[in-house]
Every structure is written in structure tokens, then in C-alpha cells.
């Protein structure tokens, strides 16, 4: 048996510049961190040659006689399209039960779809003894979603899930990606984590249609979306410098600047409800914030110093919005249990192994 997990992420700045329509013209960059809300895959060996996939979150399952019997990838979301796409991409004969579960609901703007894909790839390639570096893992997951499922997605989510940690990620015009882990003073990192708050707006969504419209407008030379994305990218670079200097107050104000720029990319990124909630948080003392992900719903990220947090929390509770506690994740995608004795799976390893959560995976 194999058990793997991968984190979701919160993005501070640069979102949208990780789309090919932008970075192929100008180069993109994103500042983000992985958090300790995880997607899990449990793989158990089968002796009958069949493949079974069960999603506990979506309450869906599929059972097929072998790889050749897998259905064609659906044009629209069916709930199991990501595991199907990963299995087809690997193209390897295997007989396994795959049980999928997560700590957060889908469509909440935290990059959960990318985390699903990265996690499945990590577990299945471990099972098949096909080692992938973190870069290879992230890039392959992106290609599966972008080209296999034909979804309008950027690259940042896959890299956040694969690497973990607080990263400054650059996307080159040539399609290359560079991940720079930010080495912050321990006190600064702890204060940053403490000053961030997440509130669920209650609106789950799929971001692909928003991103599709954004890509179309980004390819128009000199359009308003392009200028807004330039501002978002510049804000991300300034946020990095603020963190490295330990100037968290400036970081909070930059979040506000970046959010205002991001809203001008598309009218669908925010809503009257989101604007109202953000205004309530700001009136309660928050310095900045943003909707996580492409927009349209999901989690509202707020930056508030300790003296203001109770006021922000109380105001948001009065609005019927639930807070989700979290911490930063530094590990990224990993196999946390590799036990060949549970189901006599000789592919799982030559001996029982438990990988401590504190161990760092190799790049």
C-alpha cells in the first residue's frame, strides 16, 4: 500500500502571469506558499487486473477491467477526469485501487485540481518505480491538465503542490520554470503565517472559464488585461523584496495593491459579495487581501496584524463567513506510507518504510 499527500496553496501575487498567453510574451512570476491542507491518494494492489478509482469528496467511483477499458476523457468535468487523464498519460499496465480524499472542498481557489494531479502522479510513479524530480512532476501534471484535459490553466499550482514551501516562481518566455525558495528569517516567516487569515466565501467554482476569457484578452496587444497583469507581476516582485527585508506592513499594503490590479483584469474575478466582505475586513483593520485563485469565489485571504485580528474575525463571523485555520507546508508532494506488507504489493518496495513528515523530499 502507498499513501501520498500533496498540499494546496495560497498565491500572494503574480497570478495570471503563469498562463502561457502571458509568459510566452513577457515572462511571468508568482509568489506563493503551500499550506497544510492536503489531498491524499491511497493505492492498494489488486490481484484481478482491474483498476478502481473512488473519490470520497465527490462520492464517485469507477471500475474498469484494465487500462484499455478506460473511457475517453470527457469534454466537461465528470469528477474522475483527472485520475483518468493521469492513468492514460502513464499508459502503464497496473491493477490497483485508488482512493482519493481531501481536506478542503474542490473549487475553492486553493489549487486543489493541480494538487490532485500532482499527488496521483507522485503515488503512481512511485508504485511503478519511475522516479520524477519535483520539476518533472510539476511540469508533467501541468501538461496533463493543459493538453490532456484541454483546460485553460497556468503553471503555478502544480509547482506549489510539487515543491511545497514559500516560493518565488519564474516562468520564462521559452516555457522554462525556475523555483526560488525564499529564505526568510524564522521570526519573519512565523509572523507572516500568523498575520494571514483565510475565510471561505461559500462560493465554490471552476476557474477554467475565467482563465479562458483572460487568455483571450491577454493575446490582444495593448489591451487593459495586459497592463493589469504587468501591475500584478510588479506587485509580486515588490512583495518578495518586502518579505526579504522583513517589512511585513508593506507586504500587507502590497496585497491590497495587487488585488485592486487583479480585479481590473476581468469583471468576473470579484463580485459584489466579495467586494463587500473585503471592505468589511479592511474597515476592521486589515491591511490587504485578495481572493485566492483565479477569482469568482472560494477563499478570501486577509492580511491583518495581531491587534486587529479579533476585530476582523468578529466582523466576518457577523457576515456568516467561516475562518479556516492553516499553517505553511514545507514538504510538497510526498509518499508518507510505503508498506508492501499491507496488501502483498511487491511494487511498493522491498521493505516496510515510513517516511517521516519532517523529512525533505529530493528535488
Residue ranges and their predicted role:
Residues 297:
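Glycine-rich active-site/cofactor-binding loop and its immediate structural neighborhood
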Residues 87-108, 140:
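Glycine- and acidic-rich phosphate- and metal-coordinating loops
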Residues 39-40, 105:
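Histidine-centered metal-chelating micro-motifs
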Residues 1-13, 17-19, 24, 30-33, ...:
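C-terminal nucleotide
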Residues 110-134:
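DPxDG-like acidic metal-binding loop motif
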Residues 69-77, 107-114, 131:
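Short gly/ser-rich anion-binding loops that grip negatively charged ligand groups
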